[in-house]
Curated annotation (Swiss-Prot):
It holds the Pfam family GHMP_kinases_C. ATP binds at G125, A126, G127, L128, S129, S130, S131. The gene is galK. It is found in: Cytoplasm. Its main location: cytoplasm. Belongs to the GHMP kinase family. GalK subfamily. Keywords: ATP-binding, Carbohydrate metabolism, Cytoplasm, Galactose metabolism, Kinase, Magnesium, Metal-binding, Nucleotide-binding, Transferase. This is Galactokinase. Its EC number is 2.7.1.6. It is an enzyme of class 2 (transferase). Mg(2+) binds at S131, E163.
Amino acid sequence: MSELIQNVTTTFAQLFGYDATHLVQAPGRVNLIGEHTDYNDGFVLPCAINYQTVVAAAKREDFLVRLVAVDYDNDTDEFDLREEIAFQPKKMWSNYIRGVIKCLIERGFEFNGADIVVSGNVPQGAGLSSSAALEVVIGQTFKELYQLKISQAEIALNGQQAENQFVGCNCGIMDQMISAQGQANHAMLLDCRSLQTEAVAMPEQMAVVILNSNKKRGLVESEYNTRRQQCEAAAKTFGVKALRDVTLAQLTAKQAELDPVVAKRARHVITENERTLHAAQALREGNMPRLGELMAASHASMRDDFEITVKEIDTLVEIVQSVIGDQGGVRMTGGGFGGCVVALVHPKQVEAVQQAVAEHYEAATGLKASIYVCHATSGAGLVELA
């Protein structure tokens, strides 16, 4: 993160002519298990990762907000808080910030303007929640600058609202919640219905390895919407609000009444919720063989019942699995149809995993994987100014 801090503080001083008073960060995340359960009111188990979005900021006496995006060639934007905050079709990066600030105002928070320089190293388009990190870091920045009486959970909800209503992208609450509330060396078990969270300690000797398949993700939106509709149709058959409320026994008893594809989709969600709760327990106990079993079952369910994996992802999972055996776990993570694989491995195995992927993945798929070796880090907050 030190390079990011250097970038934002130097750029701030150069472009604004004075030093920033606050440095704030919010992390990206990876979901360890619990896929496509969020919109079914289920459980997820993400952790925050040590790839962050960082802001250098200072209060203003007036109501101007001046923005600089280091990662977009120091592109700038500015607006007045007393005027209507409008969507900018030509500056997508700025809309996440505008949306967060607009939603804070609508929630009744009062503050003046700010000078803000932002930069991040969360890989974009890899499904590691660079957008949620940006939304959360902006909410956190105004909290820190103006001592706003806002909880971390509300910062997360405010970010989700900005993405849904202002940016116009439908997302669950997981990404913002883990970015706002993550704890170092812990995963977070999140109940997507009650929004209750529980920090789950991770074994000390564990690396979180994220492997981007670099398979271009096609069909994501249309297939995602289809899966949501199928899950809603299944819930309707059972007369419940969401698949969270259906047991496997109930599904089996009514299977004949369901469309076979809908039944498969429902089976994934119901079993994935169970697996996520069991995985949290295995993590607490440091039971790697059990965690590995659950992650393998999760991947098989996404492949066979939810049908969201692709050949490249399955290949990547098989390569990693062959290296780690029962001493860790690996599965696809994220929406599907490409994207990333997450592996929980002993630090001593990281090099062997990297080597196996380098040797076999490109040969099998024609693609090179990008590998990020991470650890579970803390959620959004102030970075001490050195």
